[in-house]
Amino acid sequence: MRHSVLSISFAVALFLECYTPSTAIPIGKMDDVALEQDTLDSLLRVEVSENSPDSVRGRSSKIVLLADSGLWMNLNRGLPLYKLIAAAAGPDRALTLDRREAGQDLSPSISIVRRDTMRCMVGRVYRPCWEV
């Protein structure tokens, strides 16, 4: 019942809006419209010149800063514990050194620098994943 009343009222509103007859403006009226537009433009220019930075210097100005609330959350409280620990340890501690076994590679002296990433199982394989 509610959907039918709403759809009928919407259809009537659209029909009345589209059915209003359009009228032509005579040439004499056209000059008046242009004159009104010119006066509006001049008033806006006066208002803009009054609010110019030169005239604001005498008055006290307010600075408003807007920020996304997600930025504030991620500053300290929103980070997971392991990220906070890695950030507190410093950039040199964030990377770990792993050595390969002698049987895996021909040159065991080469060290591999690997980031500490989480591993998620995708299908049958563990892949690196990121926190959502």
Swiss-Prot record:
Q: Name one Pfam family in it.
A: Pro-MCH
Tissue expression profile of the protein: Pituitary gland. Produced in neurons of lateral basal hypothalamus which project both to the brain and to the neural lobe of the pituitary gland from where MCH is released.
The residue range of the signal peptide is 1-24
Cited PANTHER family: MELANIN-CONCENTRATING HORMONE (PTHR12091), PRO-MCH (PTHR12091:SF0)
Q: Which family does it belong to?
A: Belongs to the melanin-concentrating hormone family.
Keyword match Cell division: no
Gene Ontology molecular function: any one:
type 1 melanin-concentrating hormone receptor binding
Task: Report the SS bond pairs.
Answer: 120-129
Supply the source organism for this entry.
Oncorhynchus mykiss
User: Which parts of the chain are coiled coil?
Assistant: none
InterPro entries on file: Prepro-melanin_conc_hormone (IPR005456)
Could you list this entry's UniProt keywords, alphabetically sorted: Cleavage on pair of basic residues, Disulfide bond, Hormone, Neuropeptide, Signal
Q: Which GO terms describe its cellular component?
A: synapse
Q: Which gene holds the coding sequence for this protein? A: mch1
Q: What does this protein do?
A: Plays a role in skin pigmentation by antagonizing the action of melanotropin alpha. Induces melanin concentration within the melanophores. May participate in the control of the hypothalamo-pituitary adrenal gland axis by inhibiting the release of ACTH.
GO BP of this protein: chemical synaptic transmission; neuropeptide signaling pathway
Q: What is this protein called?
A: Pro-MCH 1
